[in-house]
């Protein structure tokens, strides 16, 4: 350190006290800093000569002009550095001047020339009893390690006010006023040569000898506005502990921004409320960039990236000279209790603990979040409430029924239809909806379970067969007939085929555990109108034998000839469907097979779907080869609805076995030949 190199061999008592210029920057001679510095028990080389790592070099003049002895012993090499406990904190951003309610008038002074006096107010926090005094135009002196401030006039100080411990206390002394207009202009600011501070707020701990000499000092200056009014601005803050003066510097980026404040933030004021590293956006910030003091990165990988690949701070883009990691530790207290456990802190510190490159954690200590160590536990946002029972007619995760009965459909695991709506005066309206949407957890079941469920479904439906038919005129067609399919995606008219409906695949556990999102998808995108059904092409093929496996379809197909209904559009509103002779159709134009092939009818006389128990060709079918053909194109696998296929085509399909189909309910008892079912007429 130039002329000061002899200080390392001499005691503190031998330093020349009158030479005040020794600890002033810039020094009159020599260098202020040495070639290295010691921090955290380790020695580091100074890459930038005469560079103050924690701020501007001029800030060193606030530390004092007298050398002091360090009162603490050096910590062991493997012990963490102990932090000093600050019992008092004055919030410098709350320091302000408040005009008095009544203007003070001097004797013999005119009313128009009345002077304006101000009160000094600020907010502070204290963990001990404190005595606060305000000084004006004062100088600083240290006697026996205790800081004292002496104003140039005894009238330039307030009375001492005592406060108890508390948080967010307000200092307001109406009996004490100040008039900065009485001072000269140079006295409003701080002059290093004069060493006179315009404003000093001195808060001393008042709790006996244990904390004797511990104080907090806030230095401020005055400014005059163009309209003649004055304001006060904070200059620096200091802590005096055991005779050593510590200059307080602000670190940016580690404040607890989630705390509620008295003022409202404007909508256009964009603020960074996150505590993650600005480089990787995953770990918690714990590395301070010096000298700009931006806590913006983590020490996992980003600190090394800044050291070897970048030279500027990622926030202010100024060049930096050092990186300081601040890792907060505490003694292990055992497992955290539920009351002190914070999910935000745990999630933020887990990655840093696992990926930390230097695990120099002393025995008996654990790492805590820096935000928690400085600001206390973070406020966790309330968790998203789970779905509850909505009411009598609603279940969690399911949609209410839209049928005419107004009740929820019975939850079935075997039948693909929920219920049938009542008949109205205009015609028969069927509303067929699946009992449940296929959830992701139950989209694939074993083959044996599918065949067993379909067999049981066919057995139950065969018991409800009846010869009753709705009495309706041959020309009466229902106005609308919506067929609700359970599909995982939107229905595309060009890709939809008329493959028969399969039995509903439902979750074997809770009948009300289906996904709400898929239920909404099924109800919103699977309502097929009459026009959609009429534009769909399909061939409803009954299964063949019970042998396993699927044979490839025959390349031969019966040619499709136009029927009378297609040639005469006036006879039917829908010309896309071919009909059977009059004796083989019902009043609606649907196919009627003999005895076993008739459409099952429920107890109230309403027809159910004629192809109940068949499977639907949608996105949930994996192993079923669907037959696709447009209405205006001939497909090799499509034949005329309601007609028998040629024997040559039957031979190749004789061994075809569709999964999840029970052939007993759809075969012709007299001939072992599959028939083509007509699409649902509308």
UniProtKB/Swiss-Prot annotation:
Residues with a covalently attached lipid (N-myristoyl glycine): 2
Example GO molecular function: ubiquitin protein ligase activity
Bias kind Acidic residues: ranges: 585-597
Bilayer-spanning residue ranges: none
Chain span(s) of sequence motif D-box 1: 330-333
Enzyme Commission code: 2.3.2.27
Tissue specificity statement from the Swiss-Prot or TrEMBL entry: Predominantly expressed in the brain.
Cited Gene3D superfamilies: Zinc/RING finger domain, C3HC4 (zinc finger)
Catalyses which reaction(s): S-ubiquitinyl-[E2 ubiquitin-conjugating enzyme]-L-cysteine + [acceptor protein]-L-lysine = [E2 ubiquitin-conjugating enzyme]-L-cysteine + N(6)-ubiquitinyl-[acceptor protein]-L-lysine
Pfam families: zf-C3HC4_3
UniProt keywords, alphabetically: Cytoplasm, Lipoprotein, Metal-binding, Myristate, Phosphoprotein, Transferase, Ubl conjugation pathway, Zinc, Zinc-finger
Region: Disordered, residue numbers: 440-604, 655-682
Short motif (D-box 2): ranges: 658-661
Polar residues bias: start-end ranges: 479-538
Coiled-coil segments on the chain, per record: none
Cellular component terms per the entry's GO annotation: cell body; cytoplasm
Broad class of where this protein is predominantly found: cytoplasm
Enzyme class: transferase
Zinc finger (RING-type) boundaries: 277-317
Sites of Phosphoserine modification: 662, 664-665
Superkingdom in the source lineage: Eukaryota
GO biological process: negative regulation of apoptotic process; positive regulation of dendrite extension; protein ubiquitination
Domain notes: The D-box motifs play a key role in RNF157 stabilization.
Subunit structure: Interacts with APBB1. Interacts with CHD1; CHD1-binding controls RNF157 stability. Also interacts with ATRN, MEGF8, TECR, MSI2, PLRG1, BYSL, MTERF3, PSMA1, MRPS18B, PRPF4, FASTKD2, SLC25A1, SMU1, CNOT9, MRPS2, MAGT1, FXR2, EMD, PSMD8, HDAC1, RAN, HSD17B12, TXNDC5 and MRPL19.
Protein name: E3 ubiquitin ligase Rnf157
Organism annotation: Rattus norvegicus
Gene name of the record: Rnf157
